[in-house]
Swiss-Prot record:
PANTHER family: AHPC_TSA FAMILY PROTEIN, THIOREDOXIN-DEPENDENT PEROXIDE REDUCTASE. This is Peroxiredoxin Q, chloroplastic. Keywords: Antioxidant, Chloroplast, Disulfide bond, Oxidoreductase, Peroxidase, Plastid, Redox-active center, Thylakoid, Transit peptide. InterPro entries: AhpC/TSA, Peroxiredoxin_BCP/PrxQ, Thioredoxin-like_sf, Thioredoxin_domain. Monomer. The gene is PRXQ. It is an enzyme of class 1 (oxidoreductase). GO terms for molecular function: thioredoxin peroxidase activity. Its EC number is 1.11.1.24. Residues 67-214 form the Thioredoxin domain. The lineage of its organism: Eukaryota, Viridiplantae, Streptophyta, Embryophyta, Tracheophyta. Its main location: plastid. One of its GO terms (biological process) is cell redox homeostasis.
């Protein structure tokens, strides 16, 4: 009987080549204070080569505010816009609004500062003082205060020590200093903590509403 011989070849399968598609996401790039950005020194861009770092999903959960409602915040002494030392204890005996903001002369921060200015008489009527804190130096604060006729105190937290002591959370994966406001009662106890980075004027609405409810 005749036998049939087949070539000894293993079957070959061709797989289509796959090129990973680039992840479509917005990149972060740092801009100067003078640029027109609502994000106070941070701009979102499709063209920048600087990509945001990849953080684990638990990143936000890992930030625990050190100062919460019902607590006594850490004391501090900082220089004001005139280079004079100002202590938090100076304001004890009356309600005080302490708002942390990213930087002077940035669009969102200027809008917030001017909103506090425009409502300052309402804060005074409620018996409260207003203090703004950022990492800018005293000379920057002085120019900022004079330019926009701000009637309240600005304090310089160079090195962001007080910001860290109070546990003010950052935004945009740590690239942007947080915008957080605290209301302390006459005994120095925190009664309200409000955080809203991209709606700066809401800080004024929420703190006034709270003060007027006391």
């Amino acid at each position: 009987m005749a036998t049939l011989s087949l070539p000894n070849h293993s079957p070959t399968f061709a797989l289509p080549s796959q090129t990973p598609k680039p992840h479509s996401s917005q990149n972060l790039s740092i801009i100067s204070k003078s640029a027109h950005s609502q994000f106070c020194g941070i701009k979102l861009s499709h063209s920048s080569s600087l990509s945001p770092p990849l953080y684990p999903r638990s990143y936000k959960a890992s930030i625990v505010a050190k100062v919460s409602e019902g607590s006594m915040p850490p004391a501090f002494t900082l220089k004001d816009q005139d280079g004079k030392n100002v202590s938090l204890s100076k304001f004890k005996g009356k309600p005080v609004v302490v708002y942390f903001y990213p930087a002077d002369e940035t669009p969102g921060c200027t809008k917030q500062a001017c909103a506090f200015r425009d409502s300052y008489e309402k804060f005074k009527k409620a018996g409260a003082e207003v203090i703004g804190i950022s990492g800018d130096d005293s000379s920057s604060h002085k120019a900022f205060k004079q330019k926009y006729k701000l009637p309240y105190t600005l304090l310089s937290d160079e090195g962001n020590k007080v910001r860290k002591d109070w546990g003010v959370p950052s935004d945009l994966f740590g690239a942007l200093p947080g915008r957080q406001t605290y209301v302390l009662d006459r005994n120095g106890v925190v009664r309200l903590v409000y955080n809203n980075q991209f709606q700066p004027e809401k800080h004024i609405d929420e703190t006034l509403k709270f003060l007027q409810s006391l």
